[in-house]
């Protein structure tokens, strides 16, 4: 695998176009869960995001799949054996990330207590993806730039990152320290 993530593959492009820039994630069942149903703007299920702890998640939509991982301070999204996105914390910060996808770099800001994450195009650029969750973290609204081939993967990554780390942030009373995410 080369270190530069590729641009959007065909499976992401058609999914991204059909979603038209937004989707909702809803937790399954009545208990706190780690499995989210992903719904389009008409409320129809188009996939799921299964969280498997803080270090791995699986995104599935039809016959498409991607695995999200966190190891040694680096996040990756891999689909069909190819890295399509990677992210690293900016400096010592636990709430700022640098996301790379398809030759582009995005700056992401995360607030675990507010249950919000935003990925923007560099300094002062517009938003590529915005994830905002409900008070208890069982529902998330996701908005992304439909014309940007990497905005959907960035949105899915941010959804996982916020949902997986939010509960831990509340238990600890503050965001995780360096290397704990």
Region spans (language model):
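Helix-adjacent hinge/juxtasegments
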Residues: 73-100
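Short, well-structured hydrophobic secondary-structure segments
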Residues: 48-83
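Low-complexity or membrane-interfacial segments used for flexible interactions
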Residues: 2-47, 51-54, 92-181
